Amino acid sequence: MRRSPRFSPLWLALLAGPLCSGLVLASPEVHLYVDGKPVAEALTLDKGTVSLTHKLDKGSHQIRIGDAGNSCGTSFGPTEAKPLPFGTAQPMDKCAKGTSFTLRVMLAGDYEFTFNPDTPSLKVLRATRKSEFKRQPPAEPCIAWDGGPVTVSLKGVWPDGTRLRDAYSKQEAVVKQGKLTLTPSKESGGLLLLEPVKAAKQAPFSWDQASVYFLLTDRFHNGDPANDHSFGRQKDGQDEVATWHGGDFKGLTEKLDYIKSLGMNAIWITPMVEQVHGFIGGGEQGNFPFYAYHGYWALDFTKIDPNYGNEESLRTLVDEAHKRGMRIILDVVMNHAGYATLADLQDLGLTDLTQNSGKLPATWNQWRPSGGLNWHGYNQFIDYQSPDWNKWWGPDWVRAGLPGYPQPGTDDVTGTVAGLPDFLTESTKPVGLPPLLAAKKDTRAKALPNASVSDYLIAWHTDWVRRFGIDGFRADTVKHLEPAVWAKLKQAGTAALKEWKAANPDKALDDLPFYMVGEVWDHGVAKDFWYQNGFDSLINFDYQREFALPQAQCMAGSDPTYASYASRINQDPEFNVLSYISSHDTKLFFGDYQDVPLQRRVANSFMLLPGGIQLYYGDESGRGLAKDGGVFDQSVRSDMNWQEIGSGEKAELVKHWQRLGQFRAAHPAIAAGSHKKLSDAPYSFVREKGADKVVVVFAGRQP
């Protein structure tokens, strides 16, 4: 395409005179320059704010905007060489002929540049995947299916005359001469899910067959907009990377039937206790305000954060989940508390810990960066050398880099996670309430006799079990605490749930003991000492990293994993894992390729996996990535894509996951049974546990 002509300022002045009064002039155009080279897409100066996306490699890049002649008036850059931070619009000089911004890129990928020629200013963010080139997964060889009937040998599995049903398509057929022939539904991806028409009596629930739906409460569904801005929490008016989005217990309760339709028997919710009220700077360069929407930065472990709801809405959630046969797993943090934010120091009356507070607005949480500062700039108002930090958590409770506090160590237990105040869980010293809670008027925390830090934390967490009937814990940052502390938490949780069931016999689902699954970072399918210290299961990091993609591309390649998991997990009643394809700390499976057919295929291989499984909200609906502000894990915490699943391919995707999930829910043998391969082409296997028996057939991939 031919570009519009460009004119120097002299020619523009001449053309503006009488000789050219009847002409319509082309809008002036400039380009984004990266490392001295122009990006092909032109930016038109008279159309207001414009954006473009450009792929950058990891490393440092020189960034400016201008024309080929570097002309004053159309040459935009900083007045002097300086870094270009992510997420914050940086002022520019329109006559910056020899200066550029330096942009440090940590992850190669697409980056979005937003240029306002009127200010003028430039902002950069890591682009969402929607604007990136759609990648293709690496090729994976697979058996082929022509779309026609498939015959599978069932000799030794069911006798002749047995009537079977394909749970996916609802077709039925009879075993004849040890074989059965059916045509898989095209929507199934070549699957037959064979079960006897006369089904065995369903076995009672066991945690061995856990199918867990994991969600970030704040990002799932907003049922009560009135609680969206508790403690004066604000939107940032930009990309809302890490602000509170409004999800709450009421919204989750409204979606319980949806979760049940996916075949889930448990729901893992992120920590619900009162979080720090304010924000910190997000990312290395302070690109955005980072609130504790996720739940991992606690302030008061005895209170529900009002952004999530209140005790009434929590009780309703638990009771309604139980009515549907679903358990509630609560995420708990024993390792650390939240950061000190401006809002907390003001709300808790800890003003002695600040400096230059006269420059703050009346409501400190309304501070915004200006004058070239980024969101880390709030730190200038906190006096980290004040002798009054003993009024905060106090040196008997946490280690932190503060005056009078124990200093962080270098091992897993005594080191800090992301600089968060680290609880002294290894200490056996009796302590009183931490000073900030002793002075907090609305806390439920009470001093306990002869209690250590870990004793308090255990008491606070298990109180939710005793009062509301929480069925289990997902333990955060497990390896950063002593194993014995986790064992004590499990014992206390078991006692608390037993008490609740005794007091609420009409609400108790069963007499199963308390359940605990742990996050030991990078743990795989291995039984170790953690299982002797309170844990029924551990999160399996291996499956997403090693197996999810290739087995989604060709389910026939799943058999070694299926056989290994069934043998190692299902022959040991005291061993299990929780496998996943997406999580809040790693990545979204859908985010890598944005491929709906691939997302259907991963349902086939993943939902038939032995052992426990964890479905991350939106796996079933192709939820996309959010803007991350340069912090990769923020992208995987986007809002649930309810608006996309009412119709079209995303609605059909959800139906596919529902069929797989309901089949898994109906048959304990899938998660907890023995596994035996029957044939290679078509790939087929039998799972069996007690009276429950199913056969799964994968005909192959269609060309």
Regions found by a protein language model. Give the residues of each.
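Gram-negative bacterial Sec-dependent N-terminal signal peptides
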Residues: 2-24
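Short, solvent-exposed loop/turn elements at domain surfaces
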Residues: 39-42, 72-74, 220-229, 526, ...
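Insoluble glucan recognition modules
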Residues: 19, 23-173, 186-197, 211-217
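Active-site-proximal helices and loops of the catalytic beta/alpha 8
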Residues: 132-179, 183-190, 195-197, 318, ...
